[in-house]
């Protein structure tokens, strides 16, 4: 469809443009012995990650005898075989349905040595495959440094999935970042905390001090108390709930989860469409739950749809050649939140994009406000359509998220490396407003 084409182009344009290039510049500042991983990684942990990637590669499996180099049939078809020169080898057994190909058997040690030798190969880039000469080990590090993305757009009233971009290139990366991958969702979870507070009597204009809130953890926990910081480490002023959500303030969100409890928030998130398990810990307020992009967008769509969750579907109906319907999905529809509260949450989420007013500082700010302002450095600025939103950034800039909400369409985007130990070194670069929002 046209919308699917727009979505795929948006993902490609952003990653192939400035984002991947800025990530590679960021990686150059890291010591060679740790890149592309974060600098604090333990050398043994780094080596373990690389070993897993090596053994998962087709090149290794073909050498070790777990994959046929000729027809790519897996281990069931492959049996030990004595080659004509007397050496031990492998046979893609024709009696099992294999192609009959034979090749020399190699040990793990021999494969490790082979992975350090340069060979001609094609490697992935967002601008197209590149012919180069690399050792297979260096090609693993190259793949680790690739940024990935997922995007899904859902029509709130019908649950129809209008666009689904599971990854950046199916030929090279057979993994779905929309319905399969579960990652920590960061601050995109906060609207469910604020919705719980509003449903139980809070008002968007209620004022809270921007100061640290500490919550006692179960006995034996280390540390014994949870006291989250704001990402900008700015404290002191009095802010409204609306301003706190628009600017993703951890201090106020922690106060809400302390006052209203984790169970109420978890129950609401499930009612709105979250299906994954959510840990019963206070830090869910800041997004430690690992969810799929699909369920997160579905729950945001319920907020737009007056609090009513409509189960997502990819098929509207199937007809026979005469136009008679032979299949129509039976979608689950349920009210997860009352209409009034859902409306007020959406109004608060508009502040993310439009900005929310802070009486004490005399400023209008929101984490997604760059969508509204013109800039020569961005090609997505000056957007004027009515929109709500929520940015999200997980710990150490591992994942970047953005939820964009309009009356007719809710779109969610995730951006990050496949391996959580590969990430931007600064929040300026790694925040969801920079990595995911532009898509």
Model-derived segments and their meaning:
Residues 143-149, 172-192, 205-208, 239, ...:
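Short active-site loop at a secondary-structure junction
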Residues 7, 158-159, 182-210, 216, ...:
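Active-site SXXK
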Residues 144, 148-161, 189, 195, ...:
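C-terminal substrate/ligand-recognition segments
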Residues 202-265, 309, 321-351:
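Conserved catalytic neighborhood of penicillin-recognizing serine enzymes
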Residues 1, 29, 180-181, 281-290, ...:
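Conserved short loop/turn motifs at secondary-structure junctions
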Residues 3-13, 17, 39-56, 61-64, ...:
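A penicillin-recognizing enzyme superfamily signal
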Residues 14-22, 196, 200-204, 215, ...:
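A generic secondary-structure signal for well-formed alpha-helical elements
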Residues 222-230, 261-298, 307, 311-314:
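Mid-domain, small-residue-enriched loop/turn segments at the edges of structured enzyme/sensor domains
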């Amino acid at each position: 469809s046209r919308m699917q084409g727009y979505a795929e182009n948006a993902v490609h344009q952003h990653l192939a443009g400035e984002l991947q290039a800025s990530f590679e510049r960021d990686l150059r500042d890291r010591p060679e012995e740790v890149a592309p991983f974060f600098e604090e990684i333990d050398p043994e942990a780094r080596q373990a990650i690389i070993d897993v990637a090596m053994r998962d590669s087709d090149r290794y499996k073909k050498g070790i005898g777990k994959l046929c180099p000729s027809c790519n049939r897996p281990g069931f078809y492959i049996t030990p075989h004595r080659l004509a020169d007397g050496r031990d080898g492998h046979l893609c057994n024709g009696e099992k349905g294999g192609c009959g190909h034979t090749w020399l058997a190699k040990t793990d040690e021999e494969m490790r040595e082979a992975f350090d030798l340069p060979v001609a190969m094609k490697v992935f880039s967002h601008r197209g495959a590149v012919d180069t000469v690399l050792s297979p080990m260096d090609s693993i590090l190259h793949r680790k440094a690739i940024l990935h993305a997922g995007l899904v757009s859902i029509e709130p009233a019908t649950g129809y999935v209008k666009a689904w971009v599971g990854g950046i290139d199916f030929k090279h990366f057979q993994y779905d970042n929309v319905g399969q991958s579960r990652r920590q969702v960061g601050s995109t979870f906060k609207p469910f905390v604020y919705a719980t507070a509003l449903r139980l009597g809070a008002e968007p204009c209620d004022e809270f001090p921007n100061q640290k809130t500490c919550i006692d953890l179960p006995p034996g926990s280390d540390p014994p108390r949870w006291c989250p910081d704001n990402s900008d480490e700015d404290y002191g002023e009095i802010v409204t709930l609306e301003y706190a959500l628009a600017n993703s303030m951890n201090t106020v969100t922690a106060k809400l989860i302390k006052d209203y409890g984790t169970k109420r928030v978890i129950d609401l998130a499930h009612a709105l469409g979250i299906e994954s398990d959510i840990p019963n810990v206070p830090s869910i307020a800041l997004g430690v739950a690992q969810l799929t992009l699909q369920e997160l967008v579905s729950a945001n769509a319920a907020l737009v749809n007056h609090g009513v969750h409509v189960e997502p579907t990819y098929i509207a109906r199937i007809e026979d050649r005469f136009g008679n319907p032979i299949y129509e999905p039976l979608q689950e529809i349920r009210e997860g939140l009352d209409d009034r509260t859902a409306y007020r949450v959406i109004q608060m989420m508009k502040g993310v994009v439009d900005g929310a007013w802070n009486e004490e500082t005399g400023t209008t700010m929101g984490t997604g406000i760059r969508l509204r302002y013109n800039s020569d450095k961005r090609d997505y600025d000056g957007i004027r359509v009515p929109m709500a939103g929520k940015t999200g950034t997980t710990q150490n800039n591992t994942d970047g998220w953005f939820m964009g909400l309009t009356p007719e369409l809710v779109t969610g985007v995730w951006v990050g490396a496949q391996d959580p130990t590969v990430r931007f070194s600064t929040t300026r670069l790694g925040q969801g407003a920079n990595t995911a929002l532009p898509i």
